[in-house]
Swiss-Prot record:
Sequence segments annotated as region (CNP motif): 165-167
A GO CC annotation given for this chain: T=13 icosahedral viral capsid
Family annotation (InterPro entries): VP7 (IPR001963), VP7_1 (IPR042207), VP7_2 (IPR042210)
Region (GPR motif): 253-255
Cellular localisation: Virion; Host endoplasmic reticulum lumen
Note, other: Some rotavirus strains are neuraminidase-sensitive and require sialic acid to attach to the cell surface. Some rotavirus strains are integrin-dependent. Some rotavirus strains depend on ganglioside for their entry into the host cell. Hsp70 also seems to be involved in the entry of some strains. In group A rotaviruses, VP7 defines the G serotype.
Gene3D superfamilies: Glycoprotein VP7, domain 1 (3.40.50.11130), Rotavirus outer-layer protein VP7, domain 2 (2.60.120.800)
Name of this chain's protein: Outer capsid glycoprotein VP7
Gene Ontology MF annotations: metal ion binding
Species whose genome carries this gene: Rotavirus A (strain RVA/Human/United States/Wa/1974/G1P1A[8])
Length: 326
């Protein structure tokens, strides 16, 4: 009987010792895991605070440290700046070294050599089909032309705002717009858009669904058209699909790393009257000079004031990003 009791006590003591050993081992392992996790967290925090190498790494543009914008005449580290200008500008200047000269002038305003990019486009209409705004800050120079005033306004609305867009299959489906921020945006070499509003029985309102000629034309031979129809009503859409695409888009808000500078014209284009523009601020400015050298000199002089009303953003804009931005 005593042998059985001694055996039971011995087994109990061994179990306690074994359990104590297991608990100490688990504690050491947990301490190791926790300390490693804290070390990695501190290291990542230091890196992401030092430079923009973290999870929000920009798709394009520089990875320079972000500095507060300043209007003071002191040199500070900046990010990339893209300057978009029409072919007319380089033709009038007619100087093979004009970009290098301007780069040196930007350097005096705090923009290091190599941080300013000059991008030429042929005309407003062609530029609107495939805008490529890749820099941290983007300035688009638009020469005012009364005959292109509406095209300029639509382009400004496109590039000064962010849009979430999805493709539309107008051959199979009817579409309706859900609110003021919902627009259809068509792009291509030649876009002619016609619509036929439908009642609840899918019969045409003032048009015949089987007769395209009876549809209402809302865009003709355009390269960019932002289409707005009556909300909450289905529409049958006819489109020149061989030369144009159309997307169902929702305006998300201002694209704050883009500004438009209008060259000439009696009045600056105003897109803030659009109820979907919120907040009611615009990054559009006007300079009145006949010579392009004078235009560029003015931009260099006021570049830091211009950038101050902008905000560095990580999103880029090209035709693909515009159509499928997530």
């Amino acid at each position: 009987m005593y042998g059985i009791e001694y055996t039971t006590i011995l087994i109990f003591l061994i179990s306690i010792i074994l359990l104590n050993y297991i608990l100490k081992s688990v504690t050491r392992i947990m301490d190791y895991i926790i300390y490693r996790f804290l070390l990695i967290t501190v290291a990542l925090f230091a890196l992401t605070r030092a430079q923009n190498y973290g999870l929000n790494l920009p798709i394009t543009g520089s990875m320079d440290a972000v500095y507060t914008n300043s209007t003071q005449e002191e040199v500070f580290l900046t990010s990339t700046l893209c300057l978009y200008y029409p072919t007319e500008a380089s033709t009038q200047i007619n100087d093979g070294d004009w970009k290098d000269s301007l780069s040196q002038m930007f350097l005096t305003k705090g923009w290091p050599t190599g941080s300013v990019y000059f991008k030429e486009y042929s005309n407003i209409v062609d530029f609107s089909v495939d805008p490529q705004l890749y820099c941290d800050y983007n300035l688009v120079l638009m020469k005012y032309d009364q005959s292109l005033e509406l095209d300029m306004s639509e382009l400004a609305d496109l590039i000064l705002n962010e849009w979430l867009c999805n493709p539309m299959d107008v051959t199979l489906y009817y579409y309706q717009q859900s609110g003021e921020s919902n627009k259809w945006i068509s792009m291509g070499s030649s876009c002619t858009v016609k619509v036929c509003p439908l009642n609840t029985q899918t019969l045409g309102i003032g048009c015949q669904t089987t007769n395209v000629d009876s549809f209402e034309m809302i865009a003709e031979n355009e390269k960019l058209a932002i289409v707005d129809v009556v909300d909450g009503i289905n529409h049958k859409i006819n489109l020149t699909t061989t030369t144009c695409t159309i997307r169902n888009c929702k305006k998300l808000g201002p694209r704050e790393n883009v500004a438009v500078i209008q060259v000439g014209g009696s009045n600056v284009l105003d897109i803030t009257a659009d109820p979907t523009t919120n907040p009611q601020t615009e990054r559009m400015m006007r300079v009145n000079w006949k010579k392009w050298w004078q235009v560029f000199y003015t931009i260099v002089d006021y570049i830091n004031q211009i950038v101050q009303v902008m905000s560095k953003r990580s999103r880029s804009l090209n035709s693909a990003a515009f159509y499928y931005r997530v």
